[in-house]
Amino acid sequence: LLVGGSHLIKKYGFSFTEIKKAKYKNIKIVKIDQKEANIEKIYLNIFKKSYKLFLKKRPDLVFLTGDRFEILAIASVCLYLNVKVVHLHGGEITLGAIDDAVRHAVSKIAKFHFVTTETYRNRLIQLGEEPKNIILSGSPSVENITKHKIITIHSLEKKLDIELKNYFLLTIHPETIKNQYF
């Protein structure tokens, strides 16, 4: 199991502890200097480390999830070393985000796909992927929600030290690219 990225960052929850609890054997950590804002260095570092590891271990299959640029580096290594890729969350759309290009590129490299909706399955088929290799699985994140204790409003108020009378939740996915032609 190759673990890196936000799994190793405390401010994002250091989910590596959860991975260790699952008692996987042969966990390889890929530490990337997160202070380094240079995407080129991060990408090349991931590419080099993954390439060396995959040459040594010769995996039959690599499972990638999401749309972050880091997984494109790993998918590229798999492409050149002829390692099959399983991709979770292909076919999804995030308008105005570079994520789409990364996600679709990884989907084109992948041999097998786990998608969360029929719409995303159809999108992968439109991209030329084999229908027999696309599995409608739903979202593991949604499944995970049912396993966690939901915090009460009172507990949240206490933790944040604010009173939540009339409230709403707004999430924003920042626009990372704009269509220059329209």
Regions found by a protein language model. Name each.
Residues 21-24, 80, 129-131, 163:
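Short, well-ordered coil/turn elements that cap or connect secondary structure elements
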Residues 2-42:
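Conserved nucleotide-sugar phosphate-binding/catalytic loop shared by glycosyltransferases and other
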Residues 11-15, 74, 98, 182:
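Residues at alpha-helix caps and immediate loop-helix transition turns in enzyme cores, especially N-
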Residues 7-11, 109-181:
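A nucleotide-sugar donor-handling region in carbohydrate enzymes
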Residues 1-3, 29-34, 85-90, 138, ...:
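Short beta-strands and strand-loop turn motifs
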Residues 32-131:
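Active-site and donor-binding regions of nucleotide-sugar-utilizing enzymes
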